[in-house]
């Protein structure tokens, strides 16, 4: 029986490269000379440092630009509020989403069930497996998911025939 998995995964090699390129650009830009603007990546979490809000915003814009150039969807980023870390310095954490949350998985499962397509959806950890009798039904399910859940960075993998 044909099937595929719906997942929400960022390419962490490309995320790491984008963070490194952002750090390199911060080091060479004139407007960041003599400031504490920096960026680092630890365990699927990006941390931005700066002296003021506008610096954090500039670093974030550079990061978004680098991620887009590397074909990483910026919807994977979960941006937290900036925090003061002593003196006038600020820190902002950006979490990189990985895996489908339970709420989104249930929404996806309900969407497929309500569509009256001849496919079944099952939540398997941080992925949703969709199985059906025909490939055409699976392709219709993929089109439905792309259309209705366009605000989530979902991708399809693990195709089986």
UniProtKB/Swiss-Prot annotation:
Keywords, in A-Z order: Nucleotide-binding
GO molecular function, one term: nucleotide binding
Cysteines paired by S-S bonds: none
Keyword Nucleotide-binding in record: yes
UniProt xrefs under InterPro entries: DUF520 (IPR007551), UPF0234-like_C (IPR035571), UPF0234_N (IPR035570), YajQ-like_sf (IPR036183)
Gene Ontology cellular component terms for the protein in this record: cytosol
HAMAP family linked: YajQ
Membership in a protein family: Belongs to the YajQ family.
Function: Nucleotide-binding protein.
NCBIfam families tied to this protein: PRK05412.1
Protein name, as recorded: Nucleotide-binding protein Daci_4781
Lineage summary: Bacteria, Pseudomonadati, Pseudomonadota, Betaproteobacteria, Burkholderiales
């Amino acid at each position: 029986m044909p099937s595929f998995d719906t997942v929400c995964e960022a390419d962490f090699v490309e995320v790491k490269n984008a963070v490194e390129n952002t750090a390199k650009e911060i080091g060479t830009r004139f407007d960041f000379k003599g400031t504490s603007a920096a960026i680092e990546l630890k365990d699927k979490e990006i941390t931005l440092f700066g002296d003021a809000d506008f610096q954090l915003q500039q670093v974030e814009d550079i990061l978004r630009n680098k991620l887009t150039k590397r074909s990483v969807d910026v919807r994977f980023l979960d941006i937290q509020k900036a925090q003061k870390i002593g003196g006038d310095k600020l820190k902002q954490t950006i979490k990189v989403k990985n895996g489908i949350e339970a709420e989104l998985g249930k929404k996806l499962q309900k969407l497929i069930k309500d569509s009256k397509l001849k496919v079944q959806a099952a939540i398997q950890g941080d992925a949703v497996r969709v199985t059906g009798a025909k490939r055409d039904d699976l392709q219709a399910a993929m089109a439905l998911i792309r259309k209705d859940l366009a605000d989530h960075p979902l991708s399809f993998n693990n195709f089986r025939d």
